[in-house]
Amino acid sequence: MNIILKISGKFFDEDNVNNLIVLRESIRELTDNGFRVGIVTGGGSTARRYIKLAREIGIGEAYLDLLGIWASRLNAYLVMFSLQDLAYMHVPQSLEEFIQDWSHGKVVVTGGFQPGQSTAAVAALVAEASSSKTLVVATNVDGVYEKDPRVYTDVKLIPHLTTQDLRKILEGSQSVQAGTYELLDPLAIKIVERSKIRVVVMNYRKLNRIINILKGEEVSSIIEPT
C-alpha cells in the first residue's frame, strides 16, 4: 500500500531531535508493515523568516515562493539524511524527478516544486502520481476543527468530513501569498478529489501511533473526497 506523509513546517520549528527520531522509527514501522512511503516537508519558520525579510525590501511574490521552496527542501534533506538506509538519497525538484526516484523502491522525501504551489498541493500531486489512496497531513493539532483550536478554546474536532465540508471551513481563511498556506489549499483539494484520495489529518506528536491512526483507532480527522 502506498502512502504519502505531508509534514508541516511547524514540525521543524520545534528544534526537537526526538521528533526526528520518532519520525524515523514510524517510517521504519510503516515500511516493515508493507507500506511504500513518500514524504513532503513544509518550510516552516525558516521559510517565513526569509520571506518576511525579502518582502520588506520589495522582492516579488514569485521570488518569495522560491525562498519558501528552498527552505522546504532544506527540511527535506534533514529528514532524508535522518532516515539513512530507508530513503533514496535525492530530493526531487519536480514531479518528474519524484516519479523517477519513486521507481527505486525506497522512501522519497521532497519539499516544494514550483512558485504558486503549496507543499500541500505537492503532497496531493505525489500521492496521485504514486497511486497512493491515502495522504496523511501531520500538523500540530489533532485534526480538523470548525475554528482554529490554537486561537479558540470552545472548539470540537471533526472526526469525519468531506472535501466540500473542508472548503466551507477554510473559506476566507486561505491566502495565496508566499509562506501563508495552511492545511490544504484549493489546488490540493481539487487533486485529492479528482483521484479519490482519502486525507487523514493528525498530530505529528503522535507519529509513533500512525498505524493505529490509519486504522481509525486514534484521534484524527478523515477527509473523504467528494
From Swiss-Prot:
UMP binds at G43, D65, F113, Q114, P115, G116, Q117, S118, T119. The keyword ATP-binding applies. Belongs to the UMP kinase family. GO terms for biological process: 'de novo' CTP biosynthetic process; UDP biosynthetic process. Inhibited by UTP. Catalyzes the reversible phosphorylation of UMP to UDP. It holds the Pfam family AA_kinase. One of its GO terms (cellular component) is cytoplasm. This is Uridylate kinase. InterPro entries: AceGlu_kinase-like_sf, Asp/Glu/Uridylate_kinase, Uridylate_kinase, Uridylate_kinase_arch/spir. It comes from Saccharolobus islandicus (strain L.S.2.15 / Lassen #1) (Sulfolobus islandicus). Homohexamer. The keyword Nucleotide-binding applies. It is found in: Cytoplasm. Keywords: ATP-binding, Cytoplasm, Kinase, Nucleotide-binding, Pyrimidine biosynthesis, Transferase. Its EC number is 2.7.4.22. The lineage of its organism: Archaea, Thermoproteota, Thermoprotei, Sulfolobales, Sulfolobaceae. Pathway: Pyrimidine metabolism; CTP biosynthesis via de novo pathway; UDP from UMP (UMPK route): step 1/1. One of its GO terms (molecular function) is ATP binding. CDD domains: AAK_UMPK-PyrH-Pf (cd04253). The gene is pyrH.
